[in-house]
Amino acid sequence: MLVLASNLIDFPILSIHVGGEITRTARAIVDPEDLSIIAFELVGGIVSDPEIGNFLMVEDIREYGDDGFIVDSADVFVEAQDVIRLNKILKLNFNLRGLKVVTKTKKKIGKVVDYTVDSNTFSVYQLVVQRPLMQSFVDPQLTINRSQITEIDDYSVTIDHDKEEIKLTDSSKDEEFVPNFVNPFRKPNYAGQEEESSVSDNSSKTSE
């Protein structure tokens, strides 16, 4: 399932231990080597405590759904210096959004304004590209598959050729996360099925 990365910003983080939201995402940290999200920087809530780490590694996400990312507790949050790979990428100050997109012949295609992420692997799947002004009247936005990317640097993304450009469809914008783990806010009943726990019921009532 694909989801727009922009939909993962200001996304709730829910704790099993607390039974509700404890903080939110501030930005995604993308590794330019393999174009995957490795962590989310967090802001607000419990991470305002200086003793609580302010980054969530994607491997510590138990589940993700419409309500937010579910984690065991704030104990999984880390500081940048605690994880060598994370610290290294943060020092690169890499930001996929805003990069120019050009072909091998240096023809300008546009700039990255968003990207879609595979909800199972957190790998960047497609770039959402805003076209230059004169071309935007025909194709305001395009999506480019990661397989067409040949090079990335601090300023631009180079793609194989512009023959591979595809118009962004409305269905791409509307795709949402769906859980791919058993919801820890549910518990099995005696029939071996799942039923909502009181925590889940309370969360649903609050959202209403």
Spans of model-derived segments:
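Peripheral interaction segments used for macromolecular assembly
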Residues: M1-E208
